[in-house]
């Protein structure tokens, strides 16, 4: 999408009027009354009211006066929660294509392909968001009100951004709460520098063409960034320049590490370069919780749980290791919680955003407390992203991201009745 079309899309979204609000002038005021309210940051209110206007929560409590003219939702039998936060998603992200050289002929060609493909620290997710993407609206319909938009590919992948899944009407007011002045979609950028690994990321015969090769490449990239920091006469490198905040400890480094071995490699690299580590796509953590705690590492746990391959015959046997991995995947969050490791959840790899909550429900069925699961979906995620003062709980002055359910959030039969992003209602299909 061109910059002109993106700006036009922002304009059209910003000035659309929600159903039932035509009698009001912006900012629109809503009140959900007589509901069970779960702020996350405090005690549950069994019969309370939450009021929000212009995208910001104005009052939460059991004795709240509803402003005249507010759009009121009767909350009897309903529960209000903070909106869910998905800490690993490509929804709405339209990153530029990874450069590829056709038939590289020389070592120099191969080196250029390798560097251009794998060293993209300067790629900012915030610069490539499409606010009208259907993937964002589908996430919002599933109760996900904010995502950590994460650049894909491998090597030094780029910088993530915390973004809303919809844009409200009062952009100047909401923009005051955000870092990105181009509109109300981006809440905070950058959140982290992301590092990934793969078996053969460079393609063809280019180095690195193995797992150990890409690990060596990542390490060399940080060594190059250190050299760049100290060198006096140096050619400009946008990628190495973008790595400087990470080396200085001002920007966390998010390592994609699913297995215990990968986690330990990531922690070793973080220690060697004095980085502030976050582990993403985590799945096997039982053996490394003490190491995670000692390194003060935060974890973004994958809710893309392994499933039985559809191509297998119903009576086909599977290796014990595969069965064990599938059984243990939903148990990891309880292990992290017991160890006192701060963690949140990500959906990366899930085809349906609704499975994000469904699989979070499975972690509760496998030993994680409801309170811990809710925090991982809301306030812990916001804190991990450096935005705990803006979203993640129902508190006065925070952005009005919330979901309203008929039943307990972790009951698989519960239905989401209302979703508000940036204080505006999301149309549910």
Region spans (language model):
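Bacterial N-terminal signal peptides
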Residues: 7-16
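Polyanionic/metal-chelating signatures
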Residues: 132-281
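Divalent metal-coordination and catalytic microenvironments
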Residues: 35, 50, 55, 77, ...
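C-terminal cap of metal-dependent C-N hydrolases
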Residues: 35-38, 48, 383, 395-429
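Histidine-rich, glycine-flanked metal-binding segment
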Residues: 28, 37, 41-83, 98
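Hydrophobic faces of well-ordered beta-strands that scaffold small-molecule active sites
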Residues: 85-87, 147, 253-255, 277-279, ...
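His/Asp/Glu-enriched, well-ordered alpha-helical/loop segment
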Residues: 96-97, 103-114, 122, 252, ...
